[in-house]
């Protein structure tokens, strides 16, 4: 008897690793030193509040979980993991770049480098080989736009 094929072009586990990594990243942002909110206030966004941080993530994380769950369960929804992977990959790059630019650890950098970059790159690479160019490009653009929208929400005063 053979095992059933993966439900997604990415397999079942890989898409679901993205929202799991997101939770680990949130834990790092909240629990590291004074936390990401304080880091942002001191360097980039003086009006950034814990309430805004929580509100943003209470919207974004369930959305990421839903998209990645659909991608894990149905091959025709593989493209739904692409925006999540793209946004997390960019977030990992930005945490690393911010730490270097400001000469100070940005809470979230460790999980950004250790989880977001390899997971994001793996999902994007596999999706680029599984999907037609148009759905892949749309997913990539959607992820970049979503990350930009989150950044704008964080910087809004």
Which residues does each PLM region occupy?
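Membrane-interfacial loop-to-transmembrane alpha-helix junctions, especially the N-terminal start
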Residues: 11-15, 76-84, 136-137
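Membrane-interface helix caps and helix-loop-helix hairpins in membrane proteins
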Residues: 96-107, 155-156
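Core segments of transmembrane alpha-helices
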Residues: 56-71, 88-91, 116
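N-terminal signal-anchor transmembrane alpha helix
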Residues: 8-29
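Hydrophobic alpha-helical membrane segments
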Residues: 86-95, 108-126
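Terminal transmembrane helical module of multi-pass membrane proteins
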Residues: 122-157
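Interfacial loop at the N-terminal end of multi-pass membrane proteins
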Residues: 27-53
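Aromatic-anchored segments of alpha-helical transmembrane domains
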Residues: 23-27, 87-96, 143-153
């Amino acid at each position: 008897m053979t095992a059933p094929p993966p439900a997604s072009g990415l397999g079942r586990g890989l898409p679901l690793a993205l929202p799991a990594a997101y939770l680990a990243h949130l834990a790092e942002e909240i629990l590291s030193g004074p936390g990401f909110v304080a880091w942002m206030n001191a360097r980039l966004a003086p009006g950034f509040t814990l309430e805004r941080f929580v509100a943003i993530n209470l919207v974004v994380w369930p959305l990421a979980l839903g998209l990645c769950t659909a991608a894990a369960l149905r091959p025709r929804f593989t493209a739904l993991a692409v925006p999540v992977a793209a946004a997390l990959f960019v977030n990992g790059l930005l945490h690393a770049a911010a730490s270097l630019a400001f000469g100070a650890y940005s809470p979230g950098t460790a999980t950004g480098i250790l989880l977001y970059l390899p997971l994001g790159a793996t999902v994007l690479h596999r999706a680029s080989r599984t999907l037609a160019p148009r759905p892949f490009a749309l997913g990539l653009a959607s992820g970049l736009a979503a990350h930009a929208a989150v950044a704008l929400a964080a910087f809004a005063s």
